Amino acid sequence: METTIFQFQKTFFTKPPKERVFVLHGEEQYLIRTFLSKLKEKYGENYTVLWGDEISEEEFYTALSETSIFGGSKEKAVVIYNFGDFLKKLGRKKKEKERLIKVLRNVKSNYVFIVYDAKLQKQELSSEPLKSVASFGGIVVANRLSKERIKQLVLKKFKEKGINVENDALEYLLQLTGYNLMELKLEVEKLIDYASEKKILTLDEVKRVAFSVSENVNVFEFVDLLLLKDYEKALKVLDSLISFGIHPLQIMKILSSYALKLYTLKRLEEKGEDLNKAMESVGIKNNFLKMKFKSYLKANSKEDLKNLILSLQRIDAFSKLYFQDTVQLLRDFLTSRLEREVVKNTSHGG
């Protein structure tokens, strides 16, 4: 049975369904994320996230079976991302798919949400194991909203905060973001903060404050800001990246790679090696990248880079061994760096 995300969300929190396993898919990912955010608020520490591309078969089954074993006293919500990658690990063996279906069918005391980052086609929904999930669970779709509906949602958000936005300013904001709800959420929050006192937004103000995140923000901008020690902006960009569904481990992977290369370059420099040749030896051959890395080397001492590598290793260990939230660990790391810079600048200024 397929239902819309609006219908599902309305009933789930007032009259929880008997079904226990659901597939969430659709074009409006913001609506799915909004539901999952409310789900996390409801379940707190009993809200668990699994990444299909990271977890092994046995870890996956253990996680689901544990929710059944220990779920007697406290109901849990298990959210599974990158489910397609997990299915690839199972291969084409019929028995493995049957085992997976059996495990999902036997979830009785908790809720499992299989989340896709796009709208699934009929052919995909009619293939196993999703076909079986539809029979004993549910399919929830977040269809694309009309432009008028999106406009009304944005207007409602401003009105809730008592802010009057000029019509041409609103139209500009909608065009700038391409009516993308994920981008609009970020920009509306920013504009609400900006207009919190005077309670009005003009076209010029929206042009000055808002920008289209998806066109301007990427992982490399985050890495650039961090390595140049602009931690305040790095924090904002990190939140934007996560909001757009960038996996935190992808961010960690690129940042760790840069940190290791920079540390290696510092050591080679100390030994008297030519910097350009040293860069090429670690795979940096593009002139633009060379220029970037030179600015990073100037901004960071060898000790800075060593500490950065150790911090990233700690974040990696805590997230994998103790299942701590990688994003929160990154935020804490950036916040501590920012506080340290503020103290340093204050002491120098005094």
Swiss-Prot record:
UniProt record, GO biological process: DNA-templated DNA replication
Catalyzed reactions: DNA(n) + a 2'-deoxyribonucleoside 5'-triphosphate = DNA(n+1) + diphosphate
Disulfide bonds: none
Enzyme superclass (EC): transferase
GO function terms (MF aspect): DNA binding; DNA-directed DNA polymerase activity
GO CC aspect terms: DNA polymerase III complex
EC number: 2.7.7.7
Family, per entry: Belongs to the DNA polymerase HolA subunit family.
Subunit note: Component of the DNA clamp loading complex consisting of tau(3):delta(1):delta'(1). The DNA polymerase III holoenzyme complex contains at least 10 different subunits organized into 3 functionally essential subassemblies: the Pol III core, the beta sliding clamp processivity factor and the clamp-loading complex. The Pol III core (subunits alpha, epsilon and theta) contains the polymerase and the 3'-5' exonuclease proofreading activities. The polymerase is tethered to the template via the dimeric beta sliding clamp processivity factor.
Name recorded for this polypeptide: Probable DNA polymerase III subunit delta
Native species: Aquifex aeolicus (strain VF5)
Gene: holA
